[in-house]
C-alpha cells in the first residue's frame, strides 16, 4: 500500500491477540504499523510485534523492491514495535540503526547480545537526516507514552510519523469509526500523560502536516483537524460532550435497580446522552473512556469489607491515575448496616482537580424504598440541568 509516491506501508495485522497489553479487549485485532521510505537512501520506520517477524521482513523486502535499506529508524521501544530490531539487523548487516540516547539504552536491555558497533546513528532533538529529497526531522516526545519516544517529520511529503500518537485499537482490515477505538486507546494507554501530549501538539502546530502515520491504526489523510482537536480535548481532560455515565456494581441486584432507575429518570427528563455500565460484566476500558467522554458521572456501589466493591475500586483507580478532572460526579451508595461507600468513593478523588459534587445523592439501606425513589428523582433533576 502506497502512502505517497515514496512512502510504502509495511506493517501487519494481528488477529491472534485478544487482550492488548494483557488487559484491553481488541475484538477487531491490532495493527502494528511500519513504513518504508524510498529515496537516494532508504529508511524503514520501526518494526512490529515478535509474532510477525517473517511477514514483516517479507513486507519490507517487497517495499524495497530489490534495494537494501540504509536506515532503520526506531521511534519507540515498546516490544510491539521494537521486537524485530535484532532480526532486521541480522537480515541487513549494512543498515544503520537511527535512534536517540534513551532508545539505545533500552535496546541494550532488550537485546543484550546484539552488536551495533559501527552501525549506530544517535540523534538529538530537532536534528535531521537527509535521504535525498526527503528530509526527516526528529522531534522528541518523552512520556508519550514512554520516555524514549520520538516522532519524525518528513518535510517533503509533509508526513508526521507519530509513534503511538493518533493510534487506535483494531486491525486495518476491519473498518470501523476512528473516534471510539482511538479514544479508548488514548485514555487507556496515553491518558496519564496529557501535559506531555499537549507539548507535542504545540510542536505539531508549527508543522505543515498533510498525513499522519501512527504505529497503530489507519494512516490519517483527510480532515486532520478533527483528529488533532480530539487529541487536544483528550489530553486537556475536557469533556467531549454533554452526557451522563452511570457506572455501578451490584451483588444482589439492589444497587443495579437504583442505577437503572436513575438512568430511566435521566432519559425521561431529556438528558442528551445516558450510558450505563455494569463494571463487573462490561468492558472496563470502555467505561473509563466514556467517563472521560461525557461531562457527568454517577458512581453506584455497595459497602464491601468496610470499603467499596472491588470492580468500583478498580474503576475509580483507573480514572484518577489518568488525571480525571473537570467533571460533575454524583453518588449512589448501598449498605445493610454501616454504609461507607459514598465517603470512600469521594475520598478517592481527593487529589482530582475541578470535581463538582452533586448536592443530591442516594443512600440505599439494602433495598430501594420510596424515599430512595425521591432521592433518585432529585439527583436526575440536578444532573439534567
Regions found by a protein language model. Give the residues of each.
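Short, charged N-terminal beta->alpha structural module
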Residues: 247-269
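Active-site-proximal loop/helix segment associated with metal-binding centers of metalloenzymes
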Residues: 145, 149, 165-192, 235-240
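Conserved beta-strand hairpin/beta-sheet module of binuclear metal-dependent hydrolase folds
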Residues: 2-62, 151-154, 158-162, 255
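Short N-terminal or domain-adjacent regulatory/targeting segments
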Residues: 213-240
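Active-site metal-binding motif and surrounding structural segment of the metallo-beta-lactamase
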Residues: 40, 51-98
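Metallo-beta-lactamase
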Residues: 2-5, 99-149, 193-199
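Active-site neighborhood of phospho(di)ester-bond hydrolases with catalytic His/Asp-centered motifs
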Residues: 45-47, 69-77, 97-100, 160-164, ...
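FMN-binding flavodoxin-like domain, especially the glycine-rich phosphate-binding loop
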Residues: 172-212, 216-219, 261-277, 287-385
Amino acid at each position: 500500500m502506497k502512502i505517497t509516491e515514496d512512502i510504502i506501508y509495511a506493517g501487519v495485522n494481528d488477529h491472534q491477540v485478544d487482550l492488548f497489553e494483557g488487559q484491553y479487549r481488541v475484538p477487531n485485532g491490532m495493527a502494528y504499523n511500519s513504513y518504508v521510505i524510498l529515496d537516494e537512501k532508504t529508511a524503514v520506520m520501526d518494526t512490529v510485534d515478535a509474532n510477525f517477524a517473517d511477514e514483516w521482513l517479507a513486507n519490507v523486502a517487497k517495499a524495497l523492491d530489490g534495494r537494501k535499506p540504509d536506515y532503520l529508524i526506531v521511534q519507540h521501544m515498546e516490544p510491539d514495535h521494537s521486537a524485530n530490531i535484532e532480526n532486521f539487523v541480522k537480515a541487513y548487516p549494512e543498515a544503520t540503526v537511527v535512534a536517540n540516547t534513551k532508545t539505545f539504552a533500552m535496546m541494550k536491555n532488550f537485546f543484550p547480545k546484539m552488536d551495533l558497533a559501527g552501525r549506530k546513528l544517535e540523534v538529538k532533538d530537532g536534528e535531521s537526516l537527509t535521504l535525498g529529497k526527503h528530509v526527516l526531522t526528529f522531534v522528541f516526545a518523552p512520556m508519550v507514552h514512554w520516555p524514549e519516544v520520538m516522532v519524525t517529520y518528513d518535510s517533503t511529503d509533509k508526513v508526521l510519523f507519530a509513534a503511538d500518537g493518533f493510534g487506535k485499537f483494531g486491525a486495518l482490515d476491519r473498518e470501523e469509526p476512528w473516534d471510539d477505538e482511538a479514544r479508548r486507546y488514548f485514555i487507556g494507554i496515553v491518558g496519564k500523560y496529557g501535559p506531555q501530549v499537549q507539548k507535542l501538539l504545540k510542536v505539531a502546530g508549527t508543522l505543515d502536516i498533510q498525513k499522519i502515520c501512527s504505529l497503530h491504526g489507519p494512516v490519517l489523510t483527510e480532515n486532520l483537524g478533527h483528529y488533532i482537536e480530539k487529541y487536544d480535548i483528550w489530553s486537556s481532560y475536557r469533556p467531549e460532550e454533554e452526557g451522563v455515565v452511570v457506572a455501578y456494581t451490584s451483588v444482589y441486584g439492589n444497587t443495579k435497580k437504583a442505577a437503572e432507575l436513575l438512568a430511566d429518570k435521566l432519559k425521561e427528563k431529556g438528558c442528551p446522552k445516558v450510558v450505563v455500565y455494569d463494571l463487573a460484566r462490561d468492558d472496563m476500558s470502555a467505561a473509563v473512556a466514556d467517563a472521560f467522554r461525557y461531562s457527568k458521572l454517577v458512581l453506584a456501589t455497595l459497602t464491601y469489607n468496610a470499603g467499596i466493591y472491588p470492580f468500583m475500586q478498580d474503576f475509580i483507580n483507573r480514572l484518577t491515575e489518568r488525571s480525571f478532572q473537570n467533571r460533575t460526579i454524583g453518588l449512589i451508595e448501598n449498605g445493610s448496616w454501616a454504609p461507607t461507600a459514598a465517603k470512600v468513593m469521594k475520598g478517592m478523588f481527593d487529589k482530582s482537580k475541578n470535581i463538582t459534587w452533586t448536592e443530591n445523592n442516594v443512600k440505599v439501606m439494602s433495598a430501594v424504598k420510596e424515599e430512595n425513589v425521591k432521592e433518585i428523582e432529585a439527583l436526575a433533576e440536578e444532573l439534567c440541568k
